[in-house]
Amino acid sequence: MSRKGTRSDRKHIAMERISILFSQAESFFSWNQEYSHHCVRSARLIAMKERVRIPPWLRRRYCRRCNAYLVPGVTGRVRIYRGRVIITCLTCGWHRRIPTTRSTTTNGKEKK
């Protein structure tokens, strides 16, 4: 049995489902953290199956190792160290390092 719909339709539907699952993970986190982790796992499975990239602002909200939904101060720690934002998962201890960019050069003029 073949898949119905074009590639762009399936990609669009997958992105909608991923964003819905992340919003559910955020809203249910205070009541049930395991359900939030399940939503993240489901969103990642959808992205892998349809070969869709999860947007960067959503990628920073989960742990790649244990699929935990990261909330700063509860399941994740956010620190700035040597020009990087370091996000640490408090469930498994995994670190994500995100470089920060500067908008000006060393002499104070803006980059173009």
Curated annotation (Swiss-Prot):
Zn(2+) binds at C63, C66, C89, C92. Its EC number is 3.1.26.5. It catalyses: Endonucleolytic cleavage of RNA, removing 5'-extranucleotides from tRNA precursor. One of its GO terms (cellular component) is cytoplasm. It is found in: Cytoplasm. Binds 1 zinc ion per subunit. The keyword Nuclease applies. It is an enzyme of class 3 (hydrolase). It comes from the Archaea. Its cofactor is Zn(2+). GO terms for molecular function: ribonuclease P activity; zinc ion binding. Belongs to the eukaryotic/archaeal RNase P protein component 4 family. Consists of a catalytic RNA component and at least 4-5 protein subunits. This is Ribonuclease P protein component 4. It comes from Methanospirillum hungatei JF-1 (strain ATCC 27890 / DSM 864 / NBRC 100397 / JF-1). The gene is rnp4.
